[in-house]
Amino acid sequence: MEKLGINWGLLIAQLINVVFVVWLLTTFLYRPILNMLNQRTNRIQEGLQDAERVREQLANAKRDYDAELAKARQEAASILAQAQERARAQAAEIIAQAHRDAEKIKSDTLAQAEQERQRMLGELKDRMAELVVLTAERVLNAELKANHDRLIEESLAELGKYN
């Protein structure tokens, strides 16, 4: 191979040098870079997994939030319906009480009016009785006087016949 210009000593030295450089590059450059790339890949993978977990947690939280919101809306609607029902019942009770009060006032007023009517009738009867007695007294006095005058005249006339 010397005819070809190959120097075996130099070729072996160069081969050793290449193997040594490959070993050096592999040991001090390729493996650390490969390790760094693997670590970075792992961190990216963990970040993606964390992001996926966070996305799932966020989806679960949103689902829970939506469920709680729906439940709260339902409870609010129920509370509102109950409040409206209580308000209707109270309004009905207030109206019924007002009707009862109005009826009581009406009956009290009618009773007072009847009492006043009875009192006035009693006073009227008393006054009428007084007027009847007074009128009867006057009539009787007038009749007695007329009868008395007539009797006196008749007696005088009778006496005049005897005279």
Swiss-Prot record:
A Pfam family it matches: ATP-synt_B
Compartments it resides in: Cell membrane
Keyword Membrane appears in the UniProt entry: yes
Membrane topology: Single-pass membrane protein
GO molecular function per UniProt: proton-transporting ATP synthase activity, rotational mechanism; proton-transporting ATPase activity, rotational mechanism
Signal sequence, renumbered to the chain: none
TM region positions: 9-29
Record InterPro entries: ATP_synth_B-like_membr_sf (IPR028987), ATP_synth_b/b'su_bac/chlpt (IPR002146), ATP_synth_F0_bsu_bac (IPR005864), ATP_synthase_B_chain (IPR050059)
Gene Ontology cellular component terms for the protein in this record: plasma membrane; proton-transporting ATP synthase complex
Subunit structure: F-type ATPases have 2 components, F(1) - the catalytic core - and F(0) - the membrane proton channel. F(1) has five subunits: alpha(3), beta(3), gamma(1), delta(1), epsilon(1). F(0) has four main subunits: a(1), b(2) and c(10-14). The alpha and beta chains form an alternating ring which encloses part of the gamma chain. F(1) is attached to F(0) by a central stalk formed by the gamma and epsilon chains, while a peripheral stalk is formed by the delta and b chains.
Name of the molecule in the record: ATP synthase subunit b
